[in-house]
Swiss-Prot record, chain A:
Signal peptide: none annotated. This is LOB domain-containing protein 12. GO terms for molecular function: DNA binding. Coiled coil: none annotated. Residues 7-108 form the LOB domain.
UniProtKB/Swiss-Prot annotation, chain B:
Not known; ectopic expression of LOB leads to alterations in the size and shape of leaves and floral organs and causes male and female sterility. Belongs to the LOB domain-containing protein family. This is Protein LATERAL ORGAN BOUNDARIES. PANTHER family: LOB DOMAIN-CONTAINING PROTEIN 4-RELATED, PROTEIN LATERAL ORGAN BOUNDARIES. GO terms for molecular function: transcription cis-regulatory region binding. It comes from the Eukaryota. Transmembrane segments: none annotated. It comes from Arabidopsis thaliana (Mouse-ear cress). Expressed in a band of cells at the adaxial base of all lateral organs formed from the shoot apical meristem and at the base of lateral roots. Pfam families: LOB (PF03195). Keywords: Developmental protein. GO terms for biological process: organ boundary specification between lateral organs and the meristem. Induction: Positively regulated within the shoot apex by both ASYMMETRIC LEAVES 1 (AS1) and ASYMMETRIC LEAVES 2 (AS2/LBD6) and by KNAT1. The gene is LOB.
Length: 193, 186
């Protein structure tokens, strides 16, 4: 760049001045892209851009120029809001997405909590099964006792009249014990209802 | 009051900074009060007083306050981050939008797996990409818009959305008035 035979950079061409070898614009505003410098010059001014670039290390100037070009384009497209319009729009998007995400996560949590009470219901069914089994065991005991005893009162063992009149007899005592054992599971079952 | 130049009123921050007389009708006076000298100093450093004068003269009076506030915001961002300026904030917000969109898509997929569909699950993706390569995260992150710079009146999106013409939503940028200007190579 610079010297006879080469084109001046886009900035020196626009400003109608000689492009020196150490021109600060030349590396970033090639002559084949005149619009790039024109828009930066319009929004920021050549002297301001020159000062900004001089204050930066050389390896950061390309990024600085690109961001200045972007901001200049935004300002020309929207003279009122410039880049702030884009920032405001993106901030709105972030807020909306955060709200939608919170709603979706809350629904997932509700579904997971709905699955947990179902397990408790299943547990309750198991408890009922145990009660039922206990009742069956007691019935088996009743049958065994009656069969072993060959008691003539088999058909009337549960009669309260029979129970009262035979209070002192050994078979009456056994019948009373069976009744007490049978009542326990019934009480236990009623607790679950 | 804003444009008075009698001895009872101070010159505006702009005329004080530029060491000139604050005339009646000074275009800066309504927006750069003398108690906010830093605001004009930033705008002058980044944009230049003559450029701002030209820009404001091209706007309608009721648009100038928003324009000055957005210029002040951008100037402050540029002073804080001389390399990336507002583009650093835009890149950061873009990454936030992408990350949140992915999380939302994953959550909606979970909901679909449970066999439930919600209004949010059917919502189409709403991400608009700027024509700019994401930059590294700036070392000094810009805070969200603070009350001083918050834009008054309707939001830019609401102002500009009805004026969009033609093209699908993906090609319409709500903050560029729907115009399809060709920008620089970015």
């Amino acid at each position: 760049m610079g010297g006879p035979g080469s084109s001046p950079c886009a900035s020196c061409k626009l400003l109608r001045r000689r492009c020196a070898k150490d021109c600060i614009f030349a590396p970033y505003f090639p002559p084949d892209d005149p619009h790039k410098f024109a828009i930066v010059h319009k929004v920021f001014g050549a002297s301001n851009v020159s000062k900004m670039l001089q204050e930066l290390p050389v390896h950061q100037r390309a990024d600085a120029v690109n961001s200045l070009v972007f901001e200049a384009n935004a300002r020309v497209r929207d003279p009122v809001y410039g880049c702030v319009g884009a920032i405001s729009y993106l901030q709105n998007q972030v807020s909306q997405l955060q709200m939608q995400l919170a709603v979706a996560q809350a629904e997932i949590l509700c579904i997971q909590m709905q699955n947990e009470p179902t397990l408790q219901s299943h547990h309750q069914v198991l408890e009922l099964d145990q009660d039922h089994k206990a009742l069956l065991l007691n019935n088996n005991n009743i049958n065994n006792c009656n069969t072993n005893n060959n008691n003539n009162n088999f058909g009337y063992a549960m009669s309260s009249g029979q129970f009262n009149s035979n209070f002192a007899s050994p078979s009456s005592i056994m019948q009373m014990q069976m009744q007490m054992q049978m009542q326990d599971p019934l009480k236990q079952e009623s607790l679950w209802t | 009051m804003a444009s008075s130049s009698n001895s009872y009123n101070s010159p505006c921050a702009a005329c004080k900074f530029l060491r000139r007389k604050c005339m009646p009708g000074c275009i800066f006076a309504p927006y750069f009060p003398p108690e906010e000298p830093h605001k004009f100093a930033n705008v002058h450093k980044i944009f230049g007083a003559s450029n701002v004068t030209k820009l404001l003269n091209e706007l309608l009076p009721h648009q100038r306050e928003d324009a000055v506030n957005s210029l002040a915001y951008e100037a402050e961002a540029r002073v804080r981050d001389p390399v990336y300026g507002c583009v650093g904030a835009i890149s950061y917000l873009q990454r936030q939008v992408h990350r949140l969109q992915k999380e939302l898509d994953a959550a909606n997929a979970d909901l679909a797996h449970y066999g439930l569909s919600t209004s949010a699950a059917g919502a189409p993706g709403n991400v608009v990409d700027l024509v700019f390569q994401p930059q590294p995260l700036p070392s000094q992150q810009l805070p969200p818009l603070n009350p001083v710079y918050r834009l008054s009146g309707a939001s830019p999106v609401m102002n500009q959305m009805p004026r969009g013409t033609g093209g699908s939503y993906g090609t319409f940028l709500p903050w560029n008035n729907g115009h399809d200007q060709q920008g620089g190579n970015m």
